[in-house]
């Protein structure tokens, strides 16, 4: 039994726009999965369905075999953390450490455990020099790491990262690779939406390719990235990122 499942999921926004149709994904703990596709393919909607920020119009989401139907977003977030593409949509504390520690304290985790999680999160994200800073005084890139650290401190079973490589330099990309591989080695499921094919090739064993609200292909990353016709069909509007030294 897969740990996270989307079974024939559909989602329609109140405006009437249908964002995903018949999406099915099964994922196990320890996997590293990339979700790729052009803008508007349904990637972010699919990710938000995974952690309860959105509820399926039709179909079902299951975590460890249990349907999320009727469960609150906060309950689902204990198991599945979603990190927004834009950190400013997520940060609300005026101190980095307060932001990172908010979720475990909200869930009344004991202080000894909170402190252990904070040390781990800060170490993985390289934020130690900035823990007493106002996150809004940090660069956009570092603010993204603040939100990632907050997710790590929450200690969910599943991490869903939305475009984590956007606006990152080479140092940031290397840091992200280390984080993803460290979490996977601990048995966490890591799902990442990205347009960065180099990052996908270097870090993910499995890739889900989406186009026009559907899944086109779900396979080993090397098979997908070497399928020229699939890349042309699904990623025609995606350009390679510019990496800065």
Regions found by a protein language model. Give the residues of each.
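Conserved ABC ATPase signature
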Residues: 134-138
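Conserved beta-strand-loop-alpha-helix hinge in the C-terminal portion
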Residues: 214-234
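Catalytic Walker B motif of ABC-type/P-loop ATPase nucleotide-binding domains
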Residues: 159-162
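Conserved ABC ATPase "signature" region
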Residues: 112-130
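H-loop/switch region of ABC-family ATPase nucleotide-binding domains
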Residues: 194-195
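Helix-to-loop junction immediately C-terminal to a conserved catalytic motif
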Residues: 51
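Conserved ABC transporter NBD signature motif
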Residues: 59-67, 76
């Amino acid at each position: 039994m897969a740990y996270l499942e989307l079974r024939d999921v559909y989602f329609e926004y109140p405006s009437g726009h249908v964002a995903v149709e018949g999406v099915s994904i099964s994922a196990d703990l320890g996997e590293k999965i990339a979700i790729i596709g052009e803008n508007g393919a349904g990637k972010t909607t699919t990710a938000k369905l995974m952690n309860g920020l959105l509820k399926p119009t039709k179909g079902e989401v299951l975590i460890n075999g249990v349907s999320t139907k009727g469960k609150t977003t906060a309950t689902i977030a204990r198991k599945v953390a979603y990190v927004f593409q834009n950190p400013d949509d997520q940060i609300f504390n005026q101190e980095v450490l307060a932001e990172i520690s908010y979720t475990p304290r909200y869930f009344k985790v004991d202080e000894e455990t909170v402190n252990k999680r904070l040390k781990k999160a800060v170490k993985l994200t390289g934020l130690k020099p900035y823990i007493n800073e106002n996150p809004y005084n940090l660069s956009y890139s570092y603010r993204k790491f603040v939100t990632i650290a907050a997710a790590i401190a929450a200690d969910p079973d599943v991490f869903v990262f939305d475009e984590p490589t956007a606006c990152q330099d080479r140092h940031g990309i290397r840091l992200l690779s280390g984080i993803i591989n460290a979490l996977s080695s601990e048995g966490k499921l890591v799902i990442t939406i990205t347009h960065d094919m180099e990052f996908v090739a270097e870090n993910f064993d499995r890739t889900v390719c989406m186009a026009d609200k559907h899944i086109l292909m779900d396979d080993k990353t090397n098979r997908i990235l070497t399928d020229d016709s699939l890349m042309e069909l699904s990623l025609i509007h995606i350009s390679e990122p510019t990496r800065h030294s």
